[in-house]
Protein backbone atom coordinates (compact mmCIF):
# COMPACT_ATOMS: atom_id res chain seq x y z
CA UNK A 1 0.00 0.00 0.00
CA UNK A 2 1.37 3.46 -0.90
CA UNK A 3 1.19 6.43 1.45
CA UNK A 4 -1.34 8.12 -0.81
CA UNK A 5 -3.64 5.09 -1.08
CA UNK A 6 -3.56 4.48 2.67
CA UNK A 7 -4.39 8.12 3.33
CA UNK A 8 -7.45 8.14 1.10
CA UNK A 9 -8.64 4.81 2.54
CA UNK A 10 -8.33 6.28 6.02
CA UNK A 11 -10.27 9.41 5.07
CA UNK A 12 -13.25 7.27 4.06
CA UNK A 13 -13.10 5.82 7.55
CA UNK A 14 -13.42 9.11 9.43
CA UNK A 15 -17.24 9.44 9.56
CA UNK A 16 -17.29 6.30 11.73
CA UNK A 17 -15.16 7.93 14.41
CA UNK A 18 -18.26 9.05 16.32
CA UNK A 19 -19.05 5.45 17.24
CA UNK A 20 -18.39 4.94 20.97
CA UNK A 21 -16.80 8.40 21.33
CA UNK A 22 -17.64 10.10 24.68
CA UNK A 23 -20.45 12.61 24.18
CA UNK A 24 -18.35 15.62 25.15
CA UNK A 25 -15.90 14.86 22.31
CA UNK A 26 -18.40 14.03 19.57
CA UNK A 27 -18.89 17.58 18.30
CA UNK A 28 -15.16 18.36 17.81
CA UNK A 29 -14.59 15.08 15.98
CA UNK A 30 -17.72 15.66 13.90
CA UNK A 31 -16.35 19.08 12.89
CA UNK A 32 -13.06 17.48 11.84
CA UNK A 33 -14.93 14.92 9.75
CA UNK A 34 -17.19 17.50 8.11
CA UNK A 35 -14.19 19.64 7.26
CA UNK A 36 -12.69 16.80 5.26
CA UNK A 37 -15.99 15.73 3.71
CA UNK A 38 -16.89 19.23 2.53
CA UNK A 39 -13.65 19.52 0.56
CA UNK A 40 -14.19 16.08 -0.97
CA UNK A 41 -17.72 17.07 -2.02
CA UNK A 42 -16.33 19.83 -4.25
CA UNK A 43 -13.85 17.53 -5.90
CA UNK A 44 -10.91 18.98 -4.01
CA UNK A 45 -9.78 16.29 -1.56
CA UNK A 46 -8.56 17.97 1.60
CA UNK A 47 -5.14 16.84 2.79
CA UNK A 48 -4.36 17.38 6.44
CA UNK A 49 -1.02 19.05 7.04
CA UNK A 50 1.02 20.38 9.98
CA UNK A 51 -0.64 23.76 9.35
CA UNK A 52 -3.94 22.32 10.62
CA UNK A 53 -2.50 21.67 14.07
CA UNK A 54 -0.87 23.74 16.78
CA UNK A 55 2.01 21.68 18.15
CA UNK A 56 2.53 21.82 21.90
CA UNK A 57 4.48 20.05 24.60
CA UNK A 58 6.75 17.11 23.90
CA UNK A 59 5.14 14.00 25.43
CA UNK A 60 7.75 11.35 24.71
CA UNK A 61 9.74 9.54 22.07
CA UNK A 62 10.35 6.08 20.72
CA UNK A 63 12.99 4.59 18.48
CA UNK A 64 11.50 6.10 15.31
CA UNK A 65 9.06 8.73 16.52
CA UNK A 66 8.46 11.71 18.76
CA UNK A 67 5.07 12.44 20.31
CA UNK A 68 3.68 15.93 20.93
CA UNK A 69 0.49 17.35 22.34
CA UNK A 70 -1.31 19.01 19.40
CA UNK A 71 -4.56 20.90 18.88
CA UNK A 72 -6.59 20.96 15.67
CA UNK A 73 -6.98 24.67 14.85
CA UNK A 74 -10.64 24.58 13.76
CA UNK A 75 -12.22 22.38 16.45
CA UNK A 76 -9.54 22.80 19.17
CA UNK A 77 -9.64 19.03 19.60
CA UNK A 78 -6.53 17.74 21.39
CA UNK A 79 -4.55 14.80 20.02
CA UNK A 80 -1.23 13.10 20.63
CA UNK A 81 0.72 13.74 17.42
CA UNK A 82 3.33 11.11 16.61
CA UNK A 83 5.92 12.48 14.19
CA UNK A 84 8.26 10.13 12.32
CA UNK A 85 11.02 11.09 9.90
CA UNK A 86 10.90 9.12 6.66
CA UNK A 87 14.68 8.93 6.41
CA UNK A 88 14.90 7.34 9.87
CA UNK A 89 12.22 4.83 8.89
CA UNK A 90 14.08 4.04 5.68
CA UNK A 91 17.39 3.51 7.49
CA UNK A 92 15.67 1.29 10.03
CA UNK A 93 13.90 -0.67 7.28
CA UNK A 94 10.55 -0.21 9.04
CA UNK A 95 8.49 1.54 6.34
CA UNK A 96 6.27 -1.51 5.90
CA UNK A 97 5.73 -1.75 9.65
CA UNK A 98 4.52 1.84 9.79
CA UNK A 99 2.15 1.37 6.87
CA UNK A 100 0.82 -1.82 8.45
CA UNK A 101 0.30 0.01 11.73
CA UNK A 102 -1.65 2.76 9.96
CA UNK A 103 -3.73 0.36 7.89
CA UNK A 104 -4.71 -1.86 10.82
CA UNK A 105 -5.02 0.64 13.67
CA UNK A 106 -7.19 3.04 11.65
CA UNK A 107 -9.79 0.28 11.32
CA UNK A 108 -9.90 -0.80 14.96
CA UNK A 109 -12.41 0.95 17.19
CA UNK A 110 -12.59 -0.38 20.72
CA UNK A 111 -12.55 1.32 24.14
CA UNK A 112 -9.26 -0.40 25.06
CA UNK A 113 -7.41 0.19 21.78
CA UNK A 114 -5.67 3.52 21.19
CA UNK A 115 -7.53 5.23 18.37
CA UNK A 116 -5.74 6.50 15.28
CA UNK A 117 -7.88 9.50 14.32
CA UNK A 118 -6.17 10.37 11.04
CA UNK A 119 -2.76 10.69 9.47
CA UNK A 120 -0.89 12.67 6.82
CA UNK A 121 2.63 13.22 5.55
CA UNK A 122 4.87 15.80 3.92
CA UNK A 123 8.19 15.45 2.10
CA UNK A 124 10.18 14.39 5.15
CA UNK A 125 7.77 13.31 7.89
CA UNK A 126 4.75 11.14 8.67
CA UNK A 127 2.22 12.37 11.24
CA UNK A 128 -0.18 10.15 13.19
CA UNK A 129 -2.95 11.94 15.10
CA UNK A 130 -3.71 9.65 18.03
CA UNK A 131 -6.12 9.61 20.93
CA UNK A 132 -4.58 10.94 24.14
CA UNK A 133 -3.83 8.56 27.02
CA UNK A 134 -2.69 11.09 29.59
CA UNK A 135 -0.90 8.75 32.02
CA UNK A 136 1.52 7.41 29.41
CA UNK A 137 3.13 3.99 29.14
CA UNK A 138 1.98 1.32 31.55
CA UNK A 139 5.64 0.25 31.82
CA UNK A 140 6.42 3.48 33.68
CA UNK A 141 3.71 2.77 36.26
CA UNK A 142 4.80 -0.84 36.67
CA UNK A 143 8.42 0.19 37.29
CA UNK A 144 7.24 2.84 39.75
CA UNK A 145 5.04 0.47 41.76
CA UNK A 146 6.29 -1.11 45.03
CA UNK A 147 8.61 -4.02 44.13
CA UNK A 148 7.95 -3.12 40.46
CA UNK A 149 4.65 -5.02 40.53
CA UNK A 150 0.92 -4.36 40.80
CA UNK A 151 -1.36 -5.90 43.39
CA UNK A 152 -3.71 -8.62 42.18
CA UNK A 153 -6.89 -6.49 41.92
CA UNK A 154 -5.15 -3.97 39.68
CA UNK A 155 -3.53 -6.75 37.66
CA UNK A 156 -6.87 -8.51 37.24
CA UNK A 157 -8.56 -5.38 35.91
CA UNK A 158 -5.76 -4.68 33.45
CA UNK A 159 -5.67 -8.32 32.33
CA UNK A 160 -9.40 -8.16 31.60
CA UNK A 161 -9.07 -4.98 29.54
CA UNK A 162 -6.17 -6.30 27.47
CA UNK A 163 -8.02 -9.60 26.91
CA UNK A 164 -11.07 -7.62 25.80
CA UNK A 165 -9.01 -5.62 23.29
CA UNK A 166 -7.24 -8.72 21.95
CA UNK A 167 -10.52 -10.59 21.59
CA UNK A 168 -11.84 -7.72 19.46
CA UNK A 169 -8.66 -7.83 17.35
CA UNK A 170 -9.03 -11.58 16.79
CA UNK A 171 -12.68 -11.20 15.80
CA UNK A 172 -11.38 -8.81 13.13
CA UNK A 173 -8.61 -11.23 12.03
CA UNK A 174 -5.83 -9.17 13.59
CA UNK A 175 -2.98 -10.63 15.67
CA UNK A 176 -1.09 -8.06 17.76
CA UNK A 177 2.14 -10.08 18.21
CA UNK A 178 3.98 -7.54 20.39
CA UNK A 179 2.17 -7.34 23.69
CA UNK A 180 4.22 -5.82 26.55
CA UNK A 181 3.84 -3.00 29.11
CA UNK A 182 5.68 -0.54 26.84
CA UNK A 183 2.96 -0.98 24.18
CA UNK A 184 0.05 -0.29 26.52
CA UNK A 185 -1.02 3.19 27.62
CA UNK A 186 -2.94 4.28 30.72
CA UNK A 187 -5.67 6.91 30.94
CA UNK A 188 -6.57 9.21 33.84
CA UNK A 189 -9.55 6.93 34.59
CA UNK A 190 -7.30 3.88 35.19
CA UNK A 191 -8.21 2.30 31.87
CA UNK A 192 -5.79 0.72 29.40
CA UNK A 193 -5.31 1.42 25.71
CA UNK A 194 -3.54 -1.18 23.57
CA UNK A 195 -1.14 0.60 21.20
CA UNK A 196 1.76 0.07 18.77
CA UNK A 197 0.44 -2.18 16.02
CA UNK A 198 3.72 -2.14 14.07
CA UNK A 199 4.15 -5.92 14.37
CA UNK A 200 0.47 -6.74 14.04
CA UNK A 201 -0.86 -8.77 11.13
CA UNK A 202 -4.19 -9.09 9.35
CA UNK A 203 -4.61 -12.85 9.01
CA UNK A 204 -7.82 -14.12 7.39
CA UNK A 205 -6.19 -17.55 7.03
CA UNK A 206 -4.87 -17.27 10.62
CA UNK A 207 -1.43 -18.84 10.02
CA UNK A 208 1.94 -17.02 10.15
CA UNK A 209 5.62 -17.91 10.41
CA UNK A 210 7.33 -14.54 10.99
CA UNK A 211 9.50 -14.37 14.11
CA UNK A 212 8.65 -11.05 15.73
CA UNK A 213 7.84 -9.41 19.03
CA UNK A 214 9.88 -9.10 22.22
CA UNK A 215 12.32 -11.81 23.36
CA UNK A 216 10.89 -12.42 26.84
CA UNK A 217 7.36 -12.69 25.40
CA UNK A 218 8.05 -15.10 22.52
CA UNK A 219 5.86 -18.25 22.53
CA UNK A 220 7.39 -21.73 22.04
CA UNK A 221 6.05 -22.06 18.49
CA UNK A 222 7.91 -18.89 17.41
CA UNK A 223 11.10 -19.96 19.19
CA UNK A 224 10.99 -23.28 17.32
CA UNK A 225 10.27 -21.63 13.96
CA UNK A 226 6.85 -23.25 13.57
CA UNK A 227 3.73 -21.70 12.08
CA UNK A 228 1.37 -20.08 14.56
CA UNK A 229 -2.06 -18.51 14.88
CA UNK A 230 -3.70 -15.86 17.05
CA UNK A 231 -3.16 -17.96 20.19
CA UNK A 232 0.31 -16.36 20.39
CA UNK A 233 -1.50 -13.36 21.86
CA UNK A 234 -2.89 -15.56 24.64
CA UNK A 235 0.65 -16.66 25.48
CA UNK A 236 1.80 -13.03 25.56
CA UNK A 237 -1.15 -12.14 27.80
CA UNK A 238 0.00 -14.83 30.23
CA UNK A 239 3.52 -13.34 30.25
CA UNK A 240 2.05 -9.86 30.73
CA UNK A 241 -0.14 -10.95 33.65
CA UNK A 242 2.87 -12.66 35.25
CA UNK A 243 4.92 -9.48 34.87
CA UNK A 244 2.08 -7.47 36.44
CA UNK A 245 2.03 -9.57 39.62
CA UNK A 246 5.71 -10.59 39.87
CA UNK A 247 7.59 -7.61 38.41
CA UNK A 248 9.49 -9.39 35.64
CA UNK A 249 8.73 -11.86 32.81
CA UNK A 250 8.92 -15.56 33.81
CA UNK A 251 11.60 -16.55 31.28
CA UNK A 252 13.85 -13.50 31.64
CA UNK A 253 17.54 -14.41 31.39
CA UNK A 254 20.94 -12.88 30.62
CA UNK A 255 21.15 -14.17 27.04
CA UNK A 256 18.93 -14.95 24.09
CA UNK A 257 19.84 -18.64 24.07
CA UNK A 258 19.19 -18.99 27.78
CA UNK A 259 15.78 -17.35 27.38
CA UNK A 260 14.96 -19.65 24.45
CA UNK A 261 15.98 -22.64 26.55
CA UNK A 262 13.75 -21.60 29.45
CA UNK A 263 10.80 -21.10 27.11
CA UNK A 264 11.29 -24.51 25.50
CA UNK A 265 11.55 -26.21 28.89
CA UNK A 266 8.66 -24.16 30.32
CA UNK A 267 10.69 -23.13 33.36
CA UNK A 268 8.10 -21.14 35.31
CA UNK A 269 8.27 -20.47 39.04
CA UNK A 270 5.50 -18.79 41.00
CA UNK A 271 6.36 -16.66 44.05
CA UNK A 272 4.57 -17.60 47.26
CA UNK A 273 2.62 -14.32 47.42
CA UNK A 274 0.50 -15.23 44.37
CA UNK A 275 -3.03 -16.50 44.95
CA UNK A 276 -4.27 -19.83 43.63
CA UNK A 277 -6.62 -18.11 41.15
CA UNK A 278 -3.86 -15.92 39.76
CA UNK A 279 -1.53 -18.89 39.20
CA UNK A 280 -4.39 -20.85 37.64
CA UNK A 281 -5.10 -18.10 35.11
CA UNK A 282 -1.46 -17.62 34.16
CA UNK A 283 -0.96 -21.37 33.88
CA UNK A 284 -3.98 -21.64 31.59
CA UNK A 285 -2.46 -19.10 29.20
CA UNK A 286 1.14 -20.34 29.33
CA UNK A 287 0.61 -23.74 27.76
CA UNK A 288 3.30 -25.03 25.42
CA UNK A 289 0.71 -26.50 23.05
CA UNK A 290 -1.18 -23.55 21.59
CA UNK A 291 -4.46 -25.46 21.34
CA UNK A 292 -4.40 -26.02 25.10
CA UNK A 293 -4.38 -22.32 25.99
CA UNK A 294 -7.55 -20.93 27.49
CA UNK A 295 -9.50 -18.50 25.31
CA UNK A 296 -9.69 -14.76 25.80
CA UNK A 297 -13.36 -15.14 26.74
CA UNK A 298 -12.24 -17.64 29.39
CA UNK A 299 -9.88 -14.98 30.71
CA UNK A 300 -12.57 -12.30 30.87
CA UNK A 301 -14.96 -14.60 32.75
CA UNK A 302 -12.37 -16.16 35.08
CA UNK A 303 -13.29 -15.93 38.77
CA UNK A 304 -9.94 -14.37 39.71
CA UNK A 305 -10.40 -11.65 37.10
CA UNK A 306 -14.00 -10.89 38.08
CA UNK A 307 -13.23 -10.75 41.81
CA UNK A 308 -10.14 -8.62 41.23
CA UNK A 309 -12.02 -6.15 39.04
CA UNK A 310 -14.66 -5.66 41.74
CA UNK A 311 -11.97 -5.09 44.38
CA UNK A 312 -10.09 -2.65 42.12
CA UNK A 313 -13.27 -0.62 41.70
CA UNK A 314 -13.57 -0.36 45.49
CA UNK A 315 -9.93 0.74 45.68
CA UNK A 316 -10.53 3.52 43.15
CA UNK A 317 -13.69 4.69 44.91
CA UNK A 318 -11.81 4.86 48.21
CA UNK A 319 -9.02 6.82 46.52
CA UNK A 320 -11.50 9.33 45.09
CA UNK A 321 -13.15 9.82 48.48
CA UNK A 322 -9.71 10.47 49.95
CA UNK A 323 -9.02 13.14 47.32
CA UNK A 324 -12.38 14.80 48.01
CA UNK A 325 -11.73 14.87 51.77
CA UNK A 326 -8.28 16.35 51.20
CA UNK A 327 -9.74 19.04 48.92
CA UNK A 328 -12.33 20.01 51.56
CA UNK A 329 -9.66 20.36 54.21
From Swiss-Prot:
Domain of life: Eukaryota
Any single Gene Ontology cellular-component annotation: kinetochore
Active site: 178
EC number(s) recorded for this UniProt protein: 2.7.11.1
SUPFAM superfamilies recorded: Protein kinase-like (PK-like)
Domain Protein kinase: 53-305
Cofactor: Mg(2+)
Region (Disordered): 1-21
Catalytic activity: L-seryl-[protein] + ATP = O-phospho-L-seryl-[protein] + ADP + H(+); L-threonyl-[protein] + ATP = O-phospho-L-threonyl-[protein] + ADP + H(+)
Task of the protein: Serine/threonine-protein kinase that mediates both meiotic and mitotic chromosome segregation. Required for histone H3 'Ser-10' phosphorylation. Phosphorylates mei-S332 within residues 124-126 and stabilizes its association with centromeres during meiosis. May regulate the function of the ESCRT-III complex core component shrb during abscission of germline cells in oogenesis.
Assembly mode: Interacts with Incenp and Cdc37.
Descriptive protein name: Aurora kinase B
Species of origin: Drosophila melanogaster (Fruit fly)
Gene designation: aurB
Amino acid sequence: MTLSRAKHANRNHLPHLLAKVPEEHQEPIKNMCLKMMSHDAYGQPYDWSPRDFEMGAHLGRGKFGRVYLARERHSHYLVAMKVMFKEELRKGCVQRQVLREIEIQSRLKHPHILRLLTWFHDESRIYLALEIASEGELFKHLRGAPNHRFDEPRSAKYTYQVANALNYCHLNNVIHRDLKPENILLTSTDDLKLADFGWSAHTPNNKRRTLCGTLDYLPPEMVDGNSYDDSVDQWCLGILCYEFVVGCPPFESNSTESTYSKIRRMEISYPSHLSKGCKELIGGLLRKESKGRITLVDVMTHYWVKAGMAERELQLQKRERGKENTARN
